[in-house]
Amino acid sequence: MKTIAILTSGGDAPGMNACIRSIARTCIYNGIRVMGIRSGYDGLMNGNIYEMNVSSVADIIHRGGTILGSARCPEFKTEEGQKKGAQILKDFGIDGLVVLGGDGSFKGASALSKIGISTIGIPCTIDNDMGYTDYTIGFFTAVETVSDAISKLRDTSSSHGRANIIEVMGRNCGDIALYSGVASGAESILVPEVELNIDEVTEKIERGRKRGKLHHLIMLAEGVGGAYDIKNMIEEKTGVETKVTILGHVQRGGTPCTFDRLMATQMGNLAVKLIMEEKTDLAIAMKDNKIITVPIDEAVTTKRKFRDDLYEISKEISI
């Protein structure tokens, strides 16, 4: 009997539990033993591994976070640590490992694949910053969370005639700010991929004021930085009271949206099928609305392309 293990690593993302459920149930349906590794690579290093069954994944498809947990593990970044982790997997009789996470998690999976462990990577991160796939599990739920917050901030901004800077996650990738900003009608979208032009921001605010606009929403990806500096510049140049709202880790939680659940279920099912067919050391992706695979090393090295087309649309419609 084959044995497959599941590990979640890095920042949690809504949809991880739906993916865990899909992997576990596909394994059980096909007569494969399934093991859960608690607390990511740290749990692997400590042998924190248990056998899962149908009840282990009952009533989790709608839950955010990860029932397996996640934790940092500096030891696993070393060559000795990786060899130790591989040996622990072998000691537990594990034939294949499915890793749910982002770039760092995939680098760990790639390292294990090079020392004889069959691995499959599934992209789970709200940042949508993995270049080899169009979308990552958790991204659209985070966008929904941010869009809901923007709707509430629009109400209070209009009541008081204010501008509001909404800082969202995205150190190197501004997709959360871009997608939620376009979907919510933000006047300005500030992302790390585009150089900040404060005059453009303030000119939009002033044009809006002249035609009686009461609110001004500015989306800011955290990678741009300087939320309070931008606030001060806006107030100095326009005289408009400006508030800063940092959404923080609320973006990672909550019930996963339908799209994330569907993608997670499809990817989890495919991961098991690939291991059954001995097609491993791969990463699963969504490209052009299709679920595909690429070599895991390619997934780690592919650079993210910015959605210039969507950014240009945002500029045209936020006059």
Curated annotation (Swiss-Prot):
InterPro entries named in the record: ATP_PFK, ATP_PFK_prok-type, PFKA_ATP_prok, Phosphofructokinase_CS, Phosphofructokinase_dom, PKF_sf
Catalysed reaction equations from the record: beta-D-fructose 6-phosphate + ATP = beta-D-fructose 1,6-bisphosphate + ADP + H(+)
Record key words, sorted: Allosteric enzyme, ATP-binding, Cytoplasm, Glycolysis, Kinase, Magnesium, Metal-binding, Nucleotide-binding, Transferase
Principal localisation: cytoplasm
Compartments where found: Cytoplasm
Superkingdom of the source species: Bacteria
E.C. number: 2.7.1.11
Enzyme class, UniProt record, top EC level: transferase
Gene3D superfamilies per UniProt: 3.40.50.450, Phosphofructokinase domain (3.40.50.460)
A Pfam family that the UniProt record links to this protein: PFK
One example GO MF annotation: 6-phosphofructokinase activity
Binding sites annotated in the UniProt record for ATP: G11, R72, C73, G102, D103, G104, S105
Oligomeric form and interacting partners: Homotetramer.
Family designation: Belongs to the phosphofructokinase type A (PFKA) family. ATP-dependent PFK group I subfamily. Prokaryotic clade 'B1' sub-subfamily.
Protein name per Swiss-Prot or TrEMBL: ATP-dependent 6-phosphofructokinase
Record organism: Finegoldia magna (strain ATCC 29328 / DSM 20472 / WAL 2508) (Peptostreptococcus magnus)
